[in-house]
Amino acid sequence: MLDFAIFAVTFLLALVGAVLYLYPASRQASGIPGLTPTEEKDGNLPDIVNSGSLHEFLVNLHGRYGPVVSFWFGRRLVVSLGTADALKQHFNPNKTLDPFETMLKSLLGYRSGAGSGSEDHVRRRLYGDAVTAALQSNFPLLLKLSEELLDKWLSYPETQHIPLSQHMLGFALKFVTRMVLGDTFEGEQEVIRFQKIHGTVWSEIGKGFLDGSLDKNTTRKNQYQEALMQLEAILKKIIKERKGGDFSQHTFIDSLVQRNLNEQQILEDSVVFSLAGCIVTARLCTWAIHFLTTAEEVQKKLHKEVDHVLGKGPITSEKIEQLRYCQQVLCETVRTAKLTPVSAQLQDIEGKVGPFIIPKETLVLYALGVVLQDASTWPSPHKFDPDRFADEPVMKVFSSLGFSGTWECPELRFAYVVTTVLVSVLLKKLHLLAVDRQVFEMKYELVTSCREETWITVSERH
């Protein structure tokens, strides 16, 4: 069952993957409104490509046909749900699986851990616990790296334009690599080498598999495969060292080793977190700071809370829970940026949403980017308004989508903590300012980014 689920969600990343053609799928009419196939072989793939991204395709499709829609990928029926109410009705099929993690593992070709629902649940819990334990052990390092970035920005003249996305990626990479791998990656050159490998792998996850161009370009495909092998080789070496050594620093790999996972499971989880933990954190930090530069009153209110809770002391893991408005800011950042715009589940058994029957083994997309901009759920959806999350019913809806609470993915939970620490450290000493006349265009992939670099300036608080 898990193998089939992994195959199904691979679609989100490998839209032209020939694997789908290996599984005969029903062409029966589902009765769900939507598109008929544009082409017999590719279904509606040309429509997705012409839309620019899967998210933008779904925005148009739901706008045209309503909250429950259908289309065809190859010869396979796909159903997409585009409102919170539709998602609430459907949330049943495979809740032991983390769609984000599963999508990455399917793309990377990982199949270990495929077992019963209870086994999957245990594996997911162990993975989340390992992230939490490593983060707690490395909290002083997180604070140190945040303060180093603060000092760097303080050294700039007020007119200096800072490439925000670049700095946030570098910051996230430094912390994630050392939290996962230990002091092996303390040196700048090791981080730079890892960043190059990491960038090659992630860029193809976001682009090459999305538009099918990777399979058509032998050079790029070889570079991707070589980078993935290098990434795995680095991690295998570290895993072997951590198993046989006695280290003062507790890492993510140490947490996995202590939980008696086999070497392949440890490798898979380390690769997934090294990739996803870094990118989700970098993008959340980028978007949070970007929105703070464009919302002066929000920044003032957040600075006031940071000053009240922290005073002259440093931020601690205990004080993070007291930064309630900061939590609202980050939730609104995820919503406004549509940070992870699509996830998926496989329909294990025949299901129903409203009057519509969803056939067994249908791939069901959760059009989260559409849901997060639904005016019936979020008044003034395009406005950055953290105060909306002061209302408990709003927070419950957000949690039901998997962005907080029990079902949030470990990578996002990790990113919330890291971003809270960094933003708190920066706001204590700096005003964060936007650069005039920038045009922002979102790039929708597995994790949403800015299509071009985001520039900011800073000035010291007195």
UniProtKB/Swiss-Prot annotation:
Q: Would you tell me the Gene Ontology cellular component terms?
A: membrane
Cross-referenced InterPro entries, in alphabetical order? Answer: CYP450_20A1-like (IPR052666), Cyt_P450 (IPR001128), Cyt_P450_E_grp-I (IPR002401), Cyt_P450_sf (IPR036396)
Source taxon at top rank: Eukaryota
Main location per the UniProt record: membrane
Membrane-protein topology = Single-pass membrane protein
What Gene Ontology molecular-function terms does this entry list?
A: heme binding; iron ion binding; monooxygenase activity; oxidoreductase activity, acting on paired donors, with incorporation or reduction of molecular oxygen
The transmembrane segments are 4-24
What EC number(s) does this enzyme carry?
1.14.-.-
Which Pfam family is one of those matched by this entry? p450
Q: Which residues form a coiled coil?
A: none
Q: Which family does it belong to?
A: Belongs to the cytochrome P450 family.
Specify the protein name: Cytochrome P450 20A1
Native species: Rattus norvegicus (Rat)
User: Upper lineage ranks?
Assistant: Eukaryota, Metazoa, Chordata, Craniata, Vertebrata
